[in-house]
Design a protein with these regions (language model features):
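Conserved SAM-binding loop
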Residues: 77-84, 89-200, 228, 268-270
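Conserved S-adenosyl-L-methionine
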Residues: 239-251
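Short, flexible, mixed-charge acidic loops at enzyme active sites
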Residues: 199-209
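Acceptor-substrate binding/catalytic loop of class I
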Residues: 212-229
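N-terminal, positively charged/glycine-rich alpha-helical extensions of SAM-dependent methyltransferases
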Residues: 6-7, 11-51, 55, 59
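Core SAM-dependent methyltransferase catalytic element
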Residues: 255-279
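Conserved alpha-helix/loop element of class I SAM-dependent methyltransferases that forms part
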Residues: 56-87
Length: 279
């Protein structure tokens, strides 16, 4: 029983997350994935529940995004360690769910648009944001798709795709759309699962087939992307990878830490090439 509990914590992920981009067509949503997610939407802000690893992951995601923006010169080094380090920057959180990442980004000054294909998730996110009056005017949520947002022509200082790409049917199409949203010299941040023996062993064989911690078929290992594949896809979208770091989850403390091993989880930062004549 203890082994099952530990593995369940380790492998619990937003496995029912939305698929934003299934093809190059206008429809980019998988209704079955949406339905699964809608049934669990009320769990987003239970920090000791199914989404505990995502809440804990913010301890890495927030500084990773901030430091990436410093390295790309969107944020000055003198401003980096202030409480409003992202003040004035426009960010879009693709697949924002209930707002676990969107809210803390807004709290350090960013103007954040949370985008999600689940209307239930957006409602949860909106309701929770009302609990903090300081988020007013800094955080907006929208039910929609990347295609719809890209058609509007608005540009952002950074696009964040955290724990989303492993559920895409057509990741190149999604990266192309995401890149269209990024300003020249702007950033794109990705966190996801590697397609490796270790990720198959833990996420598929043990969790789904042996212990049945999560329903069989929850994860599709073939959809996991290696860091090199993501780098190449982003390069085709005119974005150059600046850094890749492995992430590891401690099943006893429920904390994440950085590691040189990218076999299971990793974070990637890319920068969109500037227009001709830009510095």
């Amino acid at each position: 029983m203890m082994a099952k509990t530990i593995l369940r914590v380790l492998l619990s992920r937003p496995c029912f997350r939305r698929q934003f981009c299934t093809s190059g067509q206008s429809t980019s949503i998988n209704p079955e994935e949406i339905k699964k997610f809608d049934n669990l939407s009320s769990l987003w802000w239970d920090e000791a529940g199914e989404f505990r690893p995502l809440h804990s992951m913010n301890s890495l995601r927030i500084p990773f995004i901030r430091n990436g923006l410093v390295n790309s010169r969107a944020v000055s080094t003198t401003k980096a360690n202030t409480s409003r380090s992202l003040d004035g920057l426009d960010l879009v959180d693709v697949g924002c769910g209930g707002g676990i990442l969107s809210e803390p980004l807004a709290r350090i000054g960013a103007n954040v648009l949370g985008l999600d294909a689940s209307q239930e998730a957006i409602q949860i996110a909106k309701q929770h944001s009302l609990l903090d009056p300081n988020l007013s005017g800094k955080l907006q949520y929208r039910h929609g798709t990347l295609e719809e947002l890209a058609e509007e022509g608005k540009l952002f200082d950074a696009v964040i795709m955290s724990e989303v790409v492993e559920h895409m049917n057509n990741p190149q199409h999604c990266f192309n759309l995401a890149a269209k949203l990024v300003k020249p010299n702007g950033s794109l941040f990705v966190t996801t699962l590697n397609r490796s023996y270790l990720s198959w062993l833990g996420g598929i064989l043990i969790a789904e087939r042996l212990l049945k911690i999560v329903p069989p078929g929850t994860h599709d290992w073939d959809k996991f992307l290696t860091p090199l594949e993501v780098e190449n896809m982003l390069a085709d979208s005119n974005c150059n990878t600046r850094s890749v770091h492995g992430m590891a989850y401690n099943i006893l403390t429920h904390n994440w830490h950085w590691t040189s091993n990218v076999s299971i989880n990793y974070a990637l930062h890319a920068v969109k090439s500037g227009e001709k004549g830009s510095n």
